[in-house]
């Protein structure tokens, strides 16, 4: 995924009302930009940290700027725009970069499934049958650790997706939970049991039911983001 033009750099003044952030651009101009992240963004930002944002030419947009990348207190880069995760995964799937999911004949997005009115991020069709894939964006890192964690806040939606995947898996359908780790310098992912113990328990139950859990790490820069390597998933 290339940013054209490359992202612009600024400095964070504050994030507020979940979807808004005030920054100072490289030229010293104050600017309010959109923050496409509903999570806590724990350990992703600090007052005065460097941020990178994109601009939209759409005249109908109230806020032309979108916050894309943040420099974390640990000195890492984190893509805080959660909407990028699915696009990154789709790009990698179509390029055959996720070996465990290669060889599909069709890819469909936002496919209804399950009994709790869920939508799978992707359904991949193979001669042997469909595979349902849920994608989660991971940005929570810690001091002196190269292990990231998910989620960064209690996620009822994430727990529901685990239940839905597990139910399908018990019926003999292949299901995959894919962590898209949009945080530099990471080698493994774990459940953030201290933040959401119910999610961690649900993840263990889903794996026991046959849900495959994968993690792929991204390489980030103001010029672009791409998934480049498989990471370990810790139990």
UniProtKB/Swiss-Prot annotation:
GO terms for molecular function: DNA binding. Pfam families: SfsA (PF03749), SfsA_N (PF17746). Gene3D superfamilies: 2.40.50.580, 3.40.1350.60. Transmembrane segments: none annotated. InterPro entries: SfsA, SfsA_C, SfsA_N. Belongs to the SfsA family. PANTHER family: SUGAR FERMENTATION STIMULATION PROTEIN A. HAMAP family: SfsA. This is Sugar fermentation stimulation protein homolog. It comes from Ectopseudomonas mendocina (strain ymp).
